[in-house]
C-alpha cells in the first residue's frame, strides 16, 4: 500500500470515528474536536510508519507542527476523555 493510500484510509477512519469531516481536519480550525481529530490522525499515521515530513505534506502543516503533535499526543490524551476513547477504539488495520 502506498503512502497516499495509507493516508486516505486513515483519515477516512478518523473522520468517521470522530464525526469531523476530512476537510475540517485538514483545515486550520482550532476547536477542540477538530484538533483532537488532527492529533489522532497524526498519531495513527506515525504509528503506521509514515515519517513526520511525509505527514506534514499530507496535512498541510510544518514538520515542526507534526513533531509537536506526536510528542504531545499522550499528554493531550490525558486531558481529553474523548481523544482517549477514540485512540482506544479506533481500529485502523
Labelled PLM ranges:
Residues 11, 51-53:
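Helix-turn-helix DNA-binding elements, focusing on the entry/boundary residues of the two helices
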Residues 76-93:
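Short Lys/Arg-enriched helix C-cap and helix-to-coil transition segments
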Residues 16-38:
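Short, Lys/Arg-enriched anionic-surface-contact patches
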Residues 54-58:
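Short alpha-helical "recognition helix" segments of helix-turn-helix
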Residues 46, 70, 77:
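DNA major-groove recognition helix of helix-turn-helix
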Residues 34-50:
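Short, amphipathic alpha-helical "recognition" segments used to contact nucleic acids or chromatin
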Residues 63-67:
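Helix-turn-helix DNA-binding helix
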Amino acid at each position: 500500500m502506498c503512502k497516499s493510500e495509507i493516508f486516505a484510509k486513515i483519515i477516512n477512519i478518523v473522520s468517521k470515528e470522530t464525526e469531523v469531516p476530512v476537510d475540517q481536519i485538514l483545515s486550520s480550525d482550532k476547536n477542540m474536536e477538530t484538533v483532537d481529530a488532527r492529533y489522532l490522525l497524526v498519531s495513527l499515521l506515525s504509528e503506521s510508519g509514515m515519517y513526520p515530513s511525509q505527514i506534514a505534506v499530507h496535512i498541510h502543516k510544518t514538520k515542526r507542527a507534526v513533531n509537536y503533535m506526536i510528542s504531545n499526543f499522550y499528554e493531550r490524551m490525558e486531558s481529553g476523555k474523548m481523544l482517549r476513547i477514540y485512540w482506544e477504539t479506533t481500529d485502523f488495520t
